[in-house]
């Protein structure tokens, strides 16, 4: 039946982290199906076997040597369309939660640590979209999934009109596809698996 939670949900967080941290080099993954049967249709008493993952746990290494982990699940009781990430570095950290898309939490180690704790700590920074050449939607509009999709379409059409390559492009999509396929191989065979780009060339 193809991919489950990894392909459906994981592709988005993998793409987002790719744009922030660069290409992936290797992955170690566990994919599992916790609910083995589901109704054939909403309200149907007939059950059908589930043959795709509903949870995926990935350890990743980027080409630049960054290590990280990604958890993707259809099993998050009480969650809606949550997407969160945390990135920790030597000089600071970032936290983002798509439930509050207008804010990015930033920690800067250069902030004074004294007296009495100083100014250290995570700060919320406004993360409204102010993009070069932006016409609509206006930056004053609350960020959400619809606005993000509209901005993607606008930037693509703008690239076409200006005669330049659009980003992300097909190669970026193929890279994420290669990462997910490497995750499937890792889950099936165990251990770390290199991301093989040439299989889609």
Q: What is the meaning of each model-derived region?
A:
Residues 185-201:
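C-terminal capping/lid region of NAD(P)-dependent oxidoreductase domains
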